[in-house]
Swiss-Prot record:
GO terms for cellular component: cell envelope; cell surface; extracellular region. This is PE family immunomodulator PE15. Keywords: Secreted, Virulence. SUPFAM superfamilies: PE/PPE dimer-like. The keyword Amino-acid biosynthesis does not apply. It is found in: Secreted; Cell envelope; Cell surface. The lineage of its organism: Bacteria, Bacillati, Actinomycetota, Actinomycetes, Mycobacteriales. Belongs to the mycobacterial PE family. May play a pivotal role in the evasion of host immune response by M.tuberculosis. Mediates production of IL-10 via activation of the p38 and ERK1/2 mitogen-activated protein kinase (MAPK) signaling pathways. Residues 3-91 form the PE domain. It holds the Pfam family PE.
Amino acid sequence: MTLRVVPESLAGASAAIEAVTARLAAAHAAAAPFIAAVIPPGSDSVSVCNAVEFSVHGSQHVAMAAQGVEELGRSGVGVAESGASYAARDALAAASYLSGGL
């Protein structure tokens, strides 16, 4: 099995991941207040208790979404580091062939 890696493509993929991460973070930030704060429809105890429970679940969702965005951002950094590593190794390999042939 052969794996062909184009470092420039990895750099482009990393930039795309970073852009998606930024858009996703902005969307979550805009939605967080609406997800985490549920207003009870009435003043009775059942409505208030349910609103509190939904607010707790909404806050948990916001926290998990933030962790997901953070993980996506780390993935983009990893792709960029892989591309840089491939490019550096390719340059070393090319230099060894050029210096050995002279």
